[in-house]
Amino acid sequence: MKYQQSEEDYLEKILMLSEDKQNIHSIDIANEMGFSKPSVSIAMHKLADKGLINMEKNGVITLTNEGYKKASAVYERHKVISEFFMSIGISKETALEDACEIEHFISEETFNAIKNFKK
C-alpha cells in the first residue's frame, strides 16, 4: 500500500507542476517534494516502466494518458477532501496535510458522499 501512495504522490506532483511549468524534470519534483534527485530518478523510471509517464532523452517528464487519469483522480480527491475539512473549521494547513494522507485510502463511497455533501 505504501508504494501506491508514493506513486500517486509523484503523479499528483507532476500534474500540479505541469499547470505552471511546461518542461518538468526530476530536479523540479525533488525540489518540490523535498526528496533527493537520485530517489526521484529511481521513482520516475518505475513510473515510466508502468506506462504512467514518459521520460524524454533531455530529461523532460510528461504524464501518459493513463498517468494523467490517475493523477487527476488523486488531485480531485485531495481538493475535495481538503475543501470539505476547511468548510467544517479545520485549519488550512491541517486540512491539506490530512487530505494528503486520506486521499490514497478513502473508499469511493465515502469520497462521493463528501463530494455530494459539499454541493
Language-model features: locations:
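N-terminal helix-turn-helix DNA-binding core of bacterial DNA-binding proteins
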Residues: 2-35
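Residue-level signal for threonine
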Residues: 4, 63-64, 107
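DNA-binding alpha-helical recognition surfaces that contact promoter or target DNA
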Residues: 12, 42, 97
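C-terminal regulatory/oligomerization modules of transcriptional regulators
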Residues: 21, 97-119
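Basic, amphipathic "hinge/linker" alpha-helix immediately C-terminal to the N-terminal HTH DNA-binding motif
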Residues: 59-77
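A general alpha-helix detector
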Residues: 66, 80-84, 97-101
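Short, amphipathic alpha-helical interaction segments positioned at domain boundaries
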Residues: 71-92
